[in-house]
Design a protein with these regions (language model features):
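Conserved N-terminal alpha-helix of the aminotransferase class I/II PLP-enzyme fold
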Residues: 54, 61-99
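PLP-dependent class I/II
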Residues: 2-12, 22-52, 84-398
Length: 398
């Protein structure tokens, strides 16, 4: 048995289920879940129609590398979205379709880490739990960079010692952040690329929330964009992860891609030739339709903007909470312990949120998730408004 499995922490939702044991919420109140980041807006009908249309491809094995048409569409989307030089991305070398970013983010560490060198995998804290699990099962030690209000919820990369960077083989960043919604600016991304060059590590940039943002004039910047502006048109040591789950409300499609450094992509393709399933062909054709359309993405953003505005109008007077730059999460500070808050809110108002400490670890003398909760505004607008009113009543009775 793999001994590294013993190092894995219980998953946040396992902890959450245990926390709620013994509570009996009021039966007259319908349950509203703000805990899970699963999009609830309608999937684009034209994408679903294309997938059904292509069901005859079930008789064919898909290629790990994916359809050329899909890789070309992804190149076009990246080039337009992040203002990359025309033809700087080669669909044969720089793009690899994957079954959603969760699987790819985990597998990437298994392919990149040399466990014989006492490696570190550096990651934000709090974080998407896959980063830590991937590091541990690859035989690496996670190194946590706290993100707090004092740092604008961005890791203080300047506080990392040279000795730590020397041991770093892989840096996970998440921009926009989960759960904070904070966006790493382009100058910081450029400095990270310089550090990767100096200390010889790879940057894995999780950008799956990049298309959900508040200001239509300020879309979040990306790692490839920073590399391009530096003249790094080969995207050396830079790899980005994108998905249709949040962008297009297609979490069940399990469709995403990895893009960047051609040498790294080639090694990852070799790994995936042995491990992982290729994306079904009908999913790939549906993905081509999704990546090729922006109107449904704009419409999706508008729905989230409406929910943020409505919910914050209700909660801001009674809760320490700010509108994030991007993502669909609120990350408020709680007036009581985050576990106590979560359990009592469920028991009294039949609303589920996620304690912040379940998404973070103790590091450098603190736990940055303590006394915060994650609220995912994924439910319909009316449900989000109802949830906000119940949370306000709950807070007024504390």
């Amino acid at each position: 048995m793999n001994r590294q499995l013993d190092k894995l922490h219980p998953y946040p939702f396992e902890k959450l289920n245990h926390l709620k044991v013994g509570t009996t919420p009021p039966v007259e109140l319908s349950h509203i879940a703000l805990s899970i980041g699963e999009p609830k807006h309608d999937s684009p009908a034209f994408v679903v129609e294309e997938m059904v249309k292509q069901l005859n491809t079930l008789s064919n094995y898909p290629l790990t590398k994916g359809l050329p048409e899909l890789r070309q569409t992804i190149c076009q989307w990246l080039t337009q979205r992040f203002s990359l030089p025309k033809n700087s991305l080669d669909p044969e070398q720089h793009i690899l379709p994957v079954n959603g970013t969760r699987e790819a983010l985990f597998a990437f560490a298994q392919a990149m880490i040399d466990a014989t060198l006492t490696p570190l995998v550096v990651m934000p804290n709090p974080f998407y739990q896959i980063y830590e699990g991937a590091a541990l099962l690859a035989g690496a030690e996670p190194y946590y960079l706290n993100t707090t209000a004092d740092t604008g919820f961005i890791p203080d990369f300047n506080a990392v010692s040279p000795e730590t960077w020397q041991r770093c083989q892989l840096l996970y960043i998440c921009s926009p952040g989960n759960p904070t919604g904070a966006v790493i600016d382009i100058d910081t991304l450029k400095s990270l690329i310089e550090l990767a060059e100096k200390y010889d590590f790879v940057i894995a940039s999780d950008e799956c929330y990049s298309e959900i943002y508040q200001d239509e004039t300020k879309p979040p910047v990306g790692l490839l964009q920073a590399a391009s502006e530096m003249g790094n048109h080969d995207y050396k040591r830079c790899v980005v992860f994108h998905s249709l789950s949040k962008r297009s409300n297609l979490p069940g499609l399990r469709s995403g891609f990895v893009a960047g450094d051609a040498e790294v992509i080639a090694k990852f393709l070799k790994y995936r030739t042995y491990h992982g399933c290729a994306m079904p062909v009908h999913h790939q054709y549906a993905s081509i339709k999704a990546w090729g359309d922006e109107q449904h993405v704009k419409d999706n953003r508008l729905l989230y903007q409406q929910k943020f505005n409505a919910v914050l109008d209700i909660l801001s007077p009674v809760l320490n909470v700010q509108k994030p730059d991007a993502s669909f999460y609120l990350w408020p500070q709680t007036p009581v312990d985050d576990e106590t808050f979560t359990r009592a809110l469920f028991a009294q108002q039949h609303i589920t949120v996620l304690p912040g400490r379940y998404l973070s670890r103790d590091a450098q003398g603190l736990n940055p998730g303590k006394n915060r909760v994650r609220m995912a505004l994924v439910a319909p607008l009316d449900d989000c408004i109802e949830a906000a009113h119940r949370i306000k009543r709950f807070l007024n009775n504390l």
